[in-house]
Amino acid sequence: MKYCSLLLRNGEHTLKKSGILSSRLDAEILLSSIAGKDRLELISKENLKVSNEQALDFHNLIERRKKREPIAYIIKKKEFFSLPFFINSNSLIPRPETELLVEKILSIYKNKKPFILDVGTGSGCIILSLLDKMPNARGVGLEISKDTIKIAKINAKKVLKNHIFKVKFEHSSIQNFYSKKHFDVIISNPPYIPTYEIKNLSDDVKNFEPKLALDGGKDGLDVIKKVIYKSKYILKSKGILALEIGNGQYFKVSQILKNNFFRTKYLIKDFKNNIRCILSELNF
């Protein structure tokens, strides 16, 4: 048996030596996942022990984190909008900034019955968080990767439980997607990082997260342009297109929206005061 307090100190020391700023927190999360204990319990109970086998498992997880593998991929879990989502390296890790987009959509469509399309659904965190909070909403999650759709379907069962009928996932690109019924809302967190900037991302991101979910082409706008163009044909008149965008892309994206009969209604800034989301109304 090994004392958790000693394992935490050793794990923190190893990660700190590797330059990981969140070394203590990461060690606590990893040991918590191994021990099946709450983080606060690990911290507060000095005499808490785990088996030698669990201690070895913890050491192996620390070694993975030392190589910059994201915590979410190691423990296969990430909280988003207070909901637990299954995550692996086939899907982008949900970000806090994207929660701002979900909050705004909820504020607009509270107590309504929107039909929602989530383009590039990934883990399903956006569409499932919305459907969880809106009893009468229905939605479609669109995803180009078959492996990623599997993740979204797992999360749909966890989040929606007996209401899984509220969502459908389709394997398709936005260009090839067809729907008989028009949508009230189309929402997308597309790949928007310019190809040349990928190499400048942190090791946690560029070495582990799927390039398909990051690389937006030469100017970062390849997928955004496709989403905007297709949306005017499958969105209801006065419907909302909600896009997450990259730093410095607002003016270009707003012009593309204008050229495709969209009028900007809301802008959302992230925690660094950058324009992160554009919500536009279709006037077509």
Please provide the spans of the model-predicted regions.
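A short N-terminal interaction module
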Residues: 1-58
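Conserved SAM/SAH cofactor-binding pocket of Class I
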Residues: 97-200
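Mobile active-site "lid"/loop adjacent to the S-adenosyl-L-methionine
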Residues: 192-223
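Conserved AdoMet
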Residues: 33-107
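Conserved hydrophobic residues forming the short capping helix/wall of the S-adenosyl-L-methionine
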Residues: 15, 156, 160, 231, ...
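Conserved Class I SAM-dependent methyltransferase catalytic core
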Residues: 218-281
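Conserved SAM-binding loop
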Residues: 94, 118, 141, 216, ...
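Residue-level signal for inorganic ion chemistry
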Residues: 30, 68, 98, 126, ...
